[in-house]
Amino acid sequence: NTAAGSNAAQTKKGGKYVDSFMGYLNYYDPIYFTNKVFLHKACAQDVPDTTNALGGILCLWNDVRVDDKTRIALHNGMINGMMVYAERFWNGGEGSWDELSEFEDKMSYHKSHIVKNHDVRWHPNAMTSWKIKIDGNDTLYARGGAVDVNDLCTENSITVGDTVSAWAFTNFNSECDTTIKVWVGFEAAARSNRISGGIGPQGKWENQGRLFVNDKEYFPSQEWNGPEKYAFHFNTWHKPEEELPYTDEQFYWMREPLSIDLKQGDNEIKLYIPKTFRGQRWSFGFLKVTE
């Protein structure tokens, strides 16, 4: 049998196959993973094939040492990952953003009813759209509460250096003056590799990230327990750094949400999202916490 990995051409050779390309919970930002899997073409087939397409493999290989095993599912978004993976591989084919928005209603129902006794670190985010400006390149467009800028560059055949400045822009419309809570992050380190920009300086975001709402700058709402720690600009497999467990504050979806003020009408959200070193998991997250 053939595993359908990054080379989708393998699935055209005949025989039975399993999609082993998109199932790494430990690798992706859990918010981004949920969106990416729903939009993924299961087994590289436009039309579901129940004869040869046997399904997919969902795995969680937390290679970095864990000191509190109760955090593994949370750090890797296991429950929301299982929900979307089951949806995509049960139905086959690939989904659209509009269909994802509808599916988020089902996920929200499951979160509040079926798995209500579990801490599920996920909120609906498919309707958020972004304009992303990377120095020296045309404006790019993305959707979702988490964006993998590396993936976005690959999709648009853009090559950048080891460091580059970039900005992301979106708008939130509010019916009245209000305050909302959001998750904000400028990195999503893989739980299988310690390469990372580490925790930001006290009072600042990681990876030199910055957040502006209607030109007002916002800073982390919590004090870091380990400011400027765990910056490893190299792959840590088979190295001592792999033995250092991640802490909650290194994952934006594990942090206390940030309160931001919105005025009635449109509100400009602007994030500074630089690439700061070679090999960086260049990504960002910004999504409303609905509960």
What are these regions (language model features)?
Residues 194-285:
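Beta-strand-rich ligand-recognition modules
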Residues 1-132:
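Flexible, acidic glycine-rich loops studded with aromatic residues
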Residues 168-181, 258-264:
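Extracellular and analogous surface-interaction loops
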Residues 53-55, 79, 167-169, 208, ...:
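Extracellular structured ligand-interaction cores
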Residues 14-18, 55, 181, 208-210, ...:
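Beta-sheet entry/capping signal
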